[in-house]
Amino acid sequence: MTEAAEATLSADIQLIQRIIPHRYPFLLVDRVRDIVPNQSAVGIKCVTMNEPQFTGHFPGLPIFPGVQIIEAMAQTAAVLVGVSLDLADKGAKVYFMGIDGAKFRRKVVPGDVLEMTVTVKRGGGKVWKFEGRASVDGELAAEAEFAAMLDIPKG
């Protein structure tokens, strides 16, 4: 596949659910686009007032929790790994292992479309390292480096 063709890969919600085990209310990525296997991807999260976390974070002032932005980046990275290694329907899991340098730059609120760009810093084996940046309308909302472990069941 050419580099230009690879850049057009995407994952809709059906494929995402075939790759990662997360479900409502903890499935935090709606679509993944611009997938370049083993390199990068962009996750999309459409933030709505219907998010269950807004009941308590915060009543009358709904703000999408920063830790869930980081989790959305991690889920985007897991989909990138799944597409890169053709893991749909194989029961593989990508476990979040650690996070470094997390910074939150702006509030994310209902109506925002969160774009999470994840880039592979190291991958291909059991342990993958990523750099993630989340933005809304081109404005940086959060950034972090994080690691994940790939677990593929035998059989």
From Swiss-Prot:
It comes from the Bacteria. It is found in: Cytoplasm. Pfam families: FabA. SUPFAM superfamilies: Thioesterase/thiol ester dehydrase-isomerase. It is an enzyme of class 4 (lyase). The keyword Lyase applies. GO terms for cellular component: cytoplasm; membrane. Its EC number is 4.2.1.59. GO terms for molecular function: (3R)-hydroxyacyl-[acyl-carrier-protein] dehydratase activity. The active site is at residue 57. PANTHER family: 3-HYDROXYACYL-[ACYL-CARRIER-PROTEIN] DEHYDRATASE. Belongs to the thioester dehydratase family. FabZ subfamily. This is 3-hydroxyacyl-[acyl-carrier-protein] dehydratase FabZ. The lineage of its organism: Bacteria, Pseudomonadati, Pseudomonadota, Alphaproteobacteria, Rhodobacterales. The gene is fabZ.
